[in-house]
UniProtKB/Swiss-Prot annotation:
Family indicated by similarity: Belongs to the EPSP synthase family.
Function summary: Catalyzes the transfer of the enolpyruvyl moiety of phosphoenolpyruvate (PEP) to the 5-hydroxyl of shikimate-3-phosphate (S3P) to produce enolpyruvyl shikimate-3-phosphate and inorganic phosphate.
Coiled coil: none
Reaction(s) the record says it catalyses: 3-phosphoshikimate + phosphoenolpyruvate = 5-O-(1-carboxyvinyl)-3-phosphoshikimate + phosphate
Group of enzyme by EC: transferase
Gene Ontology cellular component annotations, sorted alphabetically: cytoplasm
Chief place where the protein resides: cytoplasm
PROSITE patterns attached to this UniProt entry: EPSP_SYNTHASE_1, EPSP_SYNTHASE_2
Keywords from the named record: Amino-acid biosynthesis, Aromatic amino acid biosynthesis, Cytoplasm, Transferase
GO molecular function: 3-phosphoshikimate 1-carboxyvinyltransferase activity
Recorded superkingdom: Bacteria
Protein name listed in UniProt: 3-phosphoshikimate 1-carboxyvinyltransferase
Amino-acid positions noted as binding 3-phosphoshikimate in the UniProt annotation, renumbered to this chain: K22, S23, R27, S167, Q169, D315, K342
Amino acid sequence: MQNYTVRPAKSVRGEISVPGDKSISHRSIMFGSIASGVTTVTGFLRGEDALATLEAFRAMGVQIDDDGETVTIQGRGLHGLSEPTDVLDCGNSGTSMRLLTGLLAGQNFFSVLSGDKYLRARPMKRVVGPLAQMGARISGRAGGEKAPLAIQGSKLKGIEYDSPVSSAQVKSAIMLAGLYAGGETVVREPHLSRDHSERMLRAFGAHVETFPGGVKVRGGAELTGRDIVVPGDISSAAFFLVAGLIVPGSDLLIRGVGVNPTRTGIIDVLKGMGGDLELINQRDESGEPVADIRVRHSKLTAMEISGDVVPRAIDEFPAICVAASLAQGTTVVRDAAELRVKETDRISAMADNLKRAGVSIVETPDGMEITGVSSLKGCAADSFGDHRIAMSMMVAGLVAQNETSVSDVECIATSFPGFVNLLEGVVQR
């Protein structure tokens, strides 16, 4: 396990670009593989999670070439995948496993999905359950709750499903199964989750219709390959947004960030806390809104974070916790129980680490209460093998009174392989 030591910063200044969006990178490989014709992907995230998806489709007979600039996919069509000869290894990627479960349920072959010890501990019944209602034959540990998952492809029928959770992974898995199902498949969710699948599937030619509170997919449509430009990942930009806000004297420009409205909860929250964030040069690329974001040091105040904004910021909460730890007053987070079933229990992990840094935090079943302090203490932080915990605590270390060490930082490579170098490149000491 590799530890990393962070020293306090005087400011964070400069211009950067963050790697391509992880959610869009996953989907570009999946949808391009089951489309007819060639799909090219520019800006693909070469992190471990998205590469796990890429390798899974290679294992199912898809020719995918990567010259370092562009990923080129020779699509096999909706029914052109081949039975894999070995277990498909999803690594640490919940997106790979859950979306592949939906896509593979309607194939005419057998497949097995597994992953690392963290992924094998995450809940899969939320996907397996509705897929079983569609006629899928899926078995796994703990009655289908845990991976490895064995999938015997079968004939599927469309269903109407009211999801108890707002999860783009659950929604997307059912939508992908719906491509292979007879009739229409309808998914409703309590709050709108990210809509990259809806946007991209429609661009590929799928019969996808959105309505308030849900999405409808009609099976049988052939997808056609296309060119995709992947914007910068706002979940990766989040660490630099928070760093720019909390480190005095900071002025940072992040270029080419995806600002899909289902993903901009982080911007709404940080602005709500008093953060000086400005979206400039707003534009549209491959059906996704994109902007440059300027962030400057700001005095932050506490707020309540709950309701619709939570699924729009679900992956950014570790970084938000760092901002809240330096905000005046007590920030209350509610409706975020989903954080407990991420790569680790992110509520407990951030509470544990920020307490070590001198912050007063009370955990609740679906969130936490964070009382801000004027400064953080350097500490020995535990990443818990979670990339977002590791990066969040490295950002916290920039404003600690002395050095902060973060354990097991190799996990950062799942989503942001160049994070350390990019951060050190803008930190002024």
